[in-house]
Regions:
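Secreted/periplasmic carbohydrate-active enzymes, especially glycoside hydrolases
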Residues: 1-343, 347-351, 396, 411-412, ...
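Substrate-binding/catalytic cleft of secreted carbohydrate-active enzymes
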Residues: 204-206, 318-320, 328-595, 604-605
Length: 608
């Protein structure tokens, strides 16, 4: 099997053609397309951009809220000179599931809307001709998938998604599509692990191929080769190594080759950063130096294109994070596009990488019910659907780690977001996931999950598995919000005193906290939803953080306003953004800029 999640690269032995652009598109509410032959001829004149979500491109509500099967179609040309190579189609993501057809022949199926998959079509394509590519996608939700939810049928017969999570269920081909010509024998994967030495650094590597020929690995600093080795496992010794660091990213070029005599059978290139990351004595250590995490939970979300990859938006987001003094973000609540990790590698940002395990609390208003204990069912991990859910969870976790393990920016894995974890089935569900993450990652990054409001130090059955504890807390908003901030602060301290007793030397970070603020809403004296209240809440919350030495990071919710399912508690989406959805600063952005640009990088490096 030639499964590979390596990012597509053009090299001396590999060829790429991007298939992004305007495709044809059709809804298939009756799921009749396969039998009707739509894989060969899509009966639609609709055009649709790829990558993008389809939802916000329409002006009618039925199209925006469509739930069910839908089709994409395009054509691609295979040059005659590609004959003799493996021809592979590669999708960055299709949300949430896909069946892929080439010239009417089904070549792939994939479940999960946030990670890549490919299909070898060598024996299907016609050379020196155009070939038809069709994708049957589906965006229905269920309790066996990540993220979790359900699908219900309206009185008029239309399906509608009912997510258990608080972000909009955008759908479509969200990331780039590539046509690749690859050598028959090729590099399938590689992994690295770093050690710092008195004279530089050592890089232990492993390379996976699908053939018998020898492998060489070289490391370049610009045009200068600084280390080399041979074999599918080995060590690169780098003298006077330049380390990758926060806002001072230094990247080397890694060159992996397969040789047959004097000929190069395959060549794969990537960029890596030499750095170590660990937890020691309750501190996060980057290159053996303490680092206090500051930044955001985010979403892949923007006007019009929805969750589709948009590089100008990505660029703007990183510029704003640099301006405000952030050094870290969580990929809430799913793995992001690979291009975002590449930019984090280049800009020197830290990433907590999160698998799309969200909505594991049965509620159609998860953001409120989960935090107030009103979920309709507490035992989410004791259901008939649990075995299938766990299987899909393991598959997504495996793909995420395989895809992202070589990024220097990735410092930790988040295995779940706000699961219901106070019932008996929690430990049986959590244990194999945390063990799998440890086994798969050659760098043994720390593992965590985000703890919702109703999971307290003495009730959470999952926190013992985490290498560091990540809390989502909203004292002063969902809990004791309004004029009684003093009560919120007292309750917050009471809970934190409880966590101090169960951490056992582990650090704790906040992966969510915040209030909604309608941009431009001012009120004196303050009221909830105003800029003044948001700032008062943040000042109170930060004072609590600063009181506890074991708090080692703060990732506010959210970087920018984002779209959600409509409802009486959401004013055209979630307004907790420090920036607007159009990426302009709210008043709170200046509060964070003052705080984060003055806090030392090793804030709280010594125990009190």
């Amino acid at each position: 099997m030639n499964r590979s999640l390596l990012y597509p690269r053009a090299t001396t032995t590999r060829r790429l053609i991007g298939l992004d652009g305007m495709w044809r598109f059709s809804f298939d509410p009756e799921s009749k397309g396969v039998e009707a032959g739509w894989a060969l001829d899509l009966p639609s004149s609709l055009s649709m951009p790829v990558p993008a979500s389809f939802c916000d491109l329409f002006t009618d509500k039925a199209s925006r809220e469509y739930c069910g099967d839908f089709w994409y179609e395009t054509s691609f040309f295979v040059p005659a000179e590609w004959s003799g190579w493996d021809i592979v189609l590669r999708f960055g993501s299709v949300t949430h599931r896909a069946r892929v057809f080439v010239n009417g022949v089904e070549v792939a199926q994939h479940e999960g809307g946030f990670l890549p998959f490919d299909a070898t079509v060598t024996n299907i394509v016609r050379y020196n001709q155009f070939n038809k590519l069709s994708v049957l996608a589906n965006n229905e939700l269920s309790e066996t998938m990540l993220p979790a939810g359900t699908t219900r049928t309206l009185a008029d017969g239309r399906k509608i998604a009912a997510p258990y999570f608080d972000f909009y269920n955008y759908a479509g081909i969200h990331r780039p599509v590539w046509l690749m010509a690859l050598p028959k024998e090729r590099v399938l994967d590689y992994s690295t692990r770093y050690r710092l030495t008195e004279t530089g650094a050592e890089i232990d590597y492993t390379v996976s191929t699908n053939g018998p020929h020898p492998v060489t690995v070289e490391l370049y600093d610009g045009t200068t080769r600084v280390a080399e080795s041979s074999g599918t496992t080995g060590t690169l010794v780098v003298k006077n190594a330049k380390l990758w660091n926060i806002h001072a990213a230094y990247l080397y070029d890694l060159v992996i080759r397969i040789h047959e005599g004097s000929a190069v059978v395959d060549e794969y290139l990537d960029r890596i950063g030499i750095r170590t990351f660990e937890i020691r004595h309750g501190r996060f250590l980057l290159n053996v130096s303490p680092v206090y995490l500051r930044g955001f939970g985010r979403h892949e979300d923007a006007d019009i294109r929805g969750r589709g990859l948009d590089l100008p938006t990505v660029k703007r987001d990183f510029e704003l994070m640099k301006w405000i003094g952030a050094n870290c973000f969580r990929t809430s609540h799913y793995p992001y596009a690979e291009e975002i990790y590449q930019m984090a590698d280049e800009e020197g940002f830290l990433i907590i990488d999160e698998v799309p395990a969200v909505g594991f609390m049965q509620s159609t208003a998860n953001f409120l019910a989960a935090n107030q204990g009103n979920g309709r069912q507490q035992g989410f991990f004791e259901k008939e659907t649990t075995p299938a859910l766990l299987k899909n969870h393991k598959a997504a976790l495996t793909d995420m780690i395989d895809r992202d393990k070589n990024h220097p920016s990735v410092i930790a894995w988040s295995l779940l977001n706000e699961p219901q974890c106070t019932s008996a089935g929690t430990e049986e569900y959590f244990k194999p996931l945390f063990e799998l993450a440890r086994r798969l990652d050659p760098q043994k990054r720390p593992r965590t999950y985000t703890v919702l409001m109703t999971s307290l130090p003495d009730t959470s059955k999952g926190q013992r598995f985490a290498d560091f504890v990540s809390l989502n807390r909203y004292y002063g908003w969902y809990v004791l919000g309004g004029a009684g901030l003093a009560d919120a602060e007292a309750a917050f301290h009471h809970e934190m005193d409880g966590w101090a007793k169960v951490l056992h030397g582990r650090p704790l970070i906040f992966t969510e906290y915040g209030t909604d603020n309608l941009s431009g809403a001012h009120k004196l004296p303050s009221v909830m939803w105003s800029a003044e209240y948001q700032n008062e809440y943040l000042e109170m919350t930060h004072a609590v953080f600063d009181h506890y030495d074991f708090v080692q990071g703060e990732l506010v919710w959210n970087f920018a306003d984002f779209q959600t399912t409509e409802g009486i508690l959401r004013v055209d989406g979630n307004k907790k953004g420090i920036f607007t959805r159009q990426r302009q600063p709210k008043d709170a952005a200046y509060l964070f800029r003052k705080r984060w640009t003055t806090l030392p990088i090793d804030f709280k490096k010594r125990k009190k």
